[in-house]
Amino acid sequence: MKPRMLPLLVVVVFLAIPSWAAERQRIQLLVPADKLAEVRALTSPLPNSPETAAQGKAIYDGKGACFRCHGKDGNGNGPLAARLNPSPRNFKDHGFWSQRTEGEVFWLIKNGSPGTGIVGYGDQLTDGEIWAIIQYLRSFTGEHGPP
């Protein structure tokens, strides 16, 4: 490496750290620590199928109105996204599913997450509807059901 490149490299790394830290913050645990083991063990009672994902899509686009924040394509750019801080989750991000269990996502949809735009939908959606939405969310990365 040329000596003149070192200052440039330092500047690039320095500027990248806040972006990396912001993304790490978005992946932080949102389920209370005393419930985490129980929540991570939750699994969907629904069949892992394209039909279940289609049911989830209908709820995502309709009754659940998830698209308003997360976008029609699940990339976090729905019509209300610009008003939210932090930004809505991008479900096309493969890294998200490697760091969250379906049980955690179920709990967050049902109970909400303070400090984010997601309110609890447990009084509006049945458990089955929430599980169907989760299967649809997985389809954004080409997956169905748990890994």
Task: Locate the predicted segments by residue.
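Gly/Gly-Pro-rich "capping" loops immediately C-terminal to redox-active cysteine motifs
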Residues: 57, 72-102, 106
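Bacterial N-terminal signal peptides
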Residues: 7-16
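Sequence/structural segment immediately N-terminal to covalent heme-attachment motifs in c-type
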Residues: 51-72, 81
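C-terminal capping alpha-helices of c-type cytochrome domains
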Residues: 107-114, 121-147
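Detector for the c-type heme attachment site
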Residues: 69-76, 110-111, 138
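Bacterial N-terminal signal peptides that target proteins for export
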Residues: 1-7
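Sec/Tat signal peptide C-region and signal peptidase I cleavage site
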Residues: 17-21
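Electrostatic cytochrome c docking/interface patches
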Residues: 29-61, 147
